[in-house]
Structure formats: structure tokens, C-alpha cells
């Protein structure tokens, strides 16, 4: 089949996160191993075309002329046979029933489309008009195209997707290895109270790079369906804890608000997410996203963590207790210097928990120093 096509054209409202969620759900429905994908492959092998709307409402009904009402259970073989007829098929949104067959769809001709073939133009316009996914099977080009609210995605063979996914997975493994190195260095520097803005931005940069490549691989997993099971397991193992770590680093180091500069944790995470791939490679730009000025002098200036990240590594320590400990002591160095009695002064921290925190922090401090110098 043809290469993956990710071209996007302006559509109706519902773009952004909602549109991405609909595309992901639609790709899952047509992924290998699903009954709908089996039916679409049968249409291709039979050298016929097809136009299938994955949902029915008054808007879709208003575009339908001719054809006949079926309301029968969906099967891959029925889909194949009914696509021999001229016209489109209408399925229910759960894709469990074939509602109509042989339908001529007449969408508003004023809806913009950049497609050229009649079937593809109709599919694009119908998806934009009704908001339901529409699948177009091209007989001449032998490809399956999915249209979701202005976005077109060409479905590929699993082998082609797996090839790209394995390359991305190898990249993720390298990124994760480098992330572990800089995160370990940061932990040791935190214990010694020698952290600079440069050290923090290096970790934030690597966390964001890992998150982005993982998101790309997750899309491949969706497109692969049952063929992506092993890839999904590998991905889950590699990125375990990355997303919480990303937030913890920002919570530890986002600057205190001032009259000139103020940034919340959520804003800093959003700024990091908004950086282009080129911007992400520049440490000063990453520093600005975190709320620092980004100047060379700032990158080398000393900063101290609040302690969220290290406390999160202490076993069986609830988030609410971590919040209270950070608020009470105000920084990691004071936490490291606190005795069991000092820790017990915090609301909700009894003797047993205080000893657990004290011992946990001591073990983390020792292991971090050993990893760096041994």
C-alpha cells in the first residue's frame, strides 16, 4: 500500500485534543486484527472499491439518497459483498451493524477538499460535515484512506509500520539511556547541593525527548492493532515512570514567582510541550520554558530542589505526606538534615513513617553518590 499520509486540512470545530482522540479511536477500529480491517482487506483483494461511513445521525441521513435500509449484523464478508454495489455503506458508530447499503452521498459541495478522486472527495466532505470517520477504499490505487474531521490517514501494511516503529524504539532506547545518565547525575548533585540550572534543563530536555518519541511509538501501536502487542510491552517497560518524573522535576525547580516572572508547574509543562524539535535542542530555550531567563549566566547559576523528586522515590510514601514534608522543610537539604524527631513534627508523620523517610533518604543519598563516583 501507499506510504502513510498525514496531511491535514482545515475542518469544522472539534480540532485539537478531541480530534486526536477520535483519530486514535478510528485507527484502533481499522487496525489489523479488527473485523472492519478484515473486511477492508477483502475489498482490496477483490479489486473493488468502497465508501463506508462509520456512524449515523440526522446529518448523515440528510446526505443520503437512494440505496436501501438493511440494519443487519456487521461481518467482514457482508461488508465485502455489499461493497460490490454502487454507492456507500453506512455502519452504526459501534461498527456492529450495517444500517444502509448502495447509498449515494451528497455532501455540501461548498465544503473545501483537496482530494481529486470522486470517492475521496466525497469521503473528505462527509467526514467534515458529520464528524464521523469515513473510510475510502480506492480500487485503482489499491489503498485504504481514513478521513477524520479534515485529517486523512492512509492505512499501511503492518510490515511497513513495524519497520518504522522498530527504528523509533531503538532511538527511544538510546534516549532513555542518556536520560538515566543525566538523571543519576542530577540526583548526586542534589545530595551535594551543587545543582545548576544547566543540570536541571538537561534532565528536562531529555525527559521531553523521551516523551515525544514514546508518543510517536504509541501511535504506531494503535495502527498495528494485534500486531503491535510486543511493541506495546517494550514501550511500557522503557517509559515506566517517565511522565511522573517529568512533572516532579518541574515541581522541584520551577522558580518562585516574582513581580517580573511567574510560572506555574502546569504552565511550565505546557511550555515544554509547545517547544519545536529544534528549540528543544537549545538549553537556553528549555530554561526559559521552565521559567528561567535562559542567559549563559543563568544556566550556570545554582538552584536547590524542593525535594518532591527524591521523596517520590521513598517506598510507600503518599503524595499528601510528600506535600506536607516539602511545605514544612522548604527544601531538600533541610529534609536530608532532618532527624526522626524533626520529621515527626509534620502532620500525619508518626514515628514509623519518620524512620522510613529518614532511612529511605539516607539510602537514596548513598546510592546516588556511589553511582556517580564508583
Swiss-Prot record:
Known cofactor(s): Mg(2+)
Domain DAC: 20-158
EC number(s) given by UniProt: 2.7.7.85
GO molecular function, one term: DNA binding
Reaction(s) this enzyme catalyzes, per UniProt: 2 ATP = 3',3'-c-di-AMP + 2 diphosphate
Pfam family, any one: DAC
SUPFAM superfamilies xrefs: RuvA domain 2-like, YojJ-like
Binding site for ATP: 87, 105, 118-122
GO biological process entries: DNA repair
Family named by the database record: Belongs to the DisA family.
Record-linked PANTHER family: DIADENYLATE CYCLASE, DNA INTEGRITY SCANNING PROTEIN DISA
Function: Participates in a DNA-damage check-point that is active prior to asymmetric division when DNA is damaged. DisA forms globular foci that rapidly scan along the chromosomes during sporulation, searching for lesions. When a lesion is present, DisA pauses at the lesion site. This triggers a cellular response that culminates in a temporary block in sporulation initiation.
Entry protein name: DNA integrity scanning protein DisA
This protein's encoding gene: disA
Amino acid at each position: 500500500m501507499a506510504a502513510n499520509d498525514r496531511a491535514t486540512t482545515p475542518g469544522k470545530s472539534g480540532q485539537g485534543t478531541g480530534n486526536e482522540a477520535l483519530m486514535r479511536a478510528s485507527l484502533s477500529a481499522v487496525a489489523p486484527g479488527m473485523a472492519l480491517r478484515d473486511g477492508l482487506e477483502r475489498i482490496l483483494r477483490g479489486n473493488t472499491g468502497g465508501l463506508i461511513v462509520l456512524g449515523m445521525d440526522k446529518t448523515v441521513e440528510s446526505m443520503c439518497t437512494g440505496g436501501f435500509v438493511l440494519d443487519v449484523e456487521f461481518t467482514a464478508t457482508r461488508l465485502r459483498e455489499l461493497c460490490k454495489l454502487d454507492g456507500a455503506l453506512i455502519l452504526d458508530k459501534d461498527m456492529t451493524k450495517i444500517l444502509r447499503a448502495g447509498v449515494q452521498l451528497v455532501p455540501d459541495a461548498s465544503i473545501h477538499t483537496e482530494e481529486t478522486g470522486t470517492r475521496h472527495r466525497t469521503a473528505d466532505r462527509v467526514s467534515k460535515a458529520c464528524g464521523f470517520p469515513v473510510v475510502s477504499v480506492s480500487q485503482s490505487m489499491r489503498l485504504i484512506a481514513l478521513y477524520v474531521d479534515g485529517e486523512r490517514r492512509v492505512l499501511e501494511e503492518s510490515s511497513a509500520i513495524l519497520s518504522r516503529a522498530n527504528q523509533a524504539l531503538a532511538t527511544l532506547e538510546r534516549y532513555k539511556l542518556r536520560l538515566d545518565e543525566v538523571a543519576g547525575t542530577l540526583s548526586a548533585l542534589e545530595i551535594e547541593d551543587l545543582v545548576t540550572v544547566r543540570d536541571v534543563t538537561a534532565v528536562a530536555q531529555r525527559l521531553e525527548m523521551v516523551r515525544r518519541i514514546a508518543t510517536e511509538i504509541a501511535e504506531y501501536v494503535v495502527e498495528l492493532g494485534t500486531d503491535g502487542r510486543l511493541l506495546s510491552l517494550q514501550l511500557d517497560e522503557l517509559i515506566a515512570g517517565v511522565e511522573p518524573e517529568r512533572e516532579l522535576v518541574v515541581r522541584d525547580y520551577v522558580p518562585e514567582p516574582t513581580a517580573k516572572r511567574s510560572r506555574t508547574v502546569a504552565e511550565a509543562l505546557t511550555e515544554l510541550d509547545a517547544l519545536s524539535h529544534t528549540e528543544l535542542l537549545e538549553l537556553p530555550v528549555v530554561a526559559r520554558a521552565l521559567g528561567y531567563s535562559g542567559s549563559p549566566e543563568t544556566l550556570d547559576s545554582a538552584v536547590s530542589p524542593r525535594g518532591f523528586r527524591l521523596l517520590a522515590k521513598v517506598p510507600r510514601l503518599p503524595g499528601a505526606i510528600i506535600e506536607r514534608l516539602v511545605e514544612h522543610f522548604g527544601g531538600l537539604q533541610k529534609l536530608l538534615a532532618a532527624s526522626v524527631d524533626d520529621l515527626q513534627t509534620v502532620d500525619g508523620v508518626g514515628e514509623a513513617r519518620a524512620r522510613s523517610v529518614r532511612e529511605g533518604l539516607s539510602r537514596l543519598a548513598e546510592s546516588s553518590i556511589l553511582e556517580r563516583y564508583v
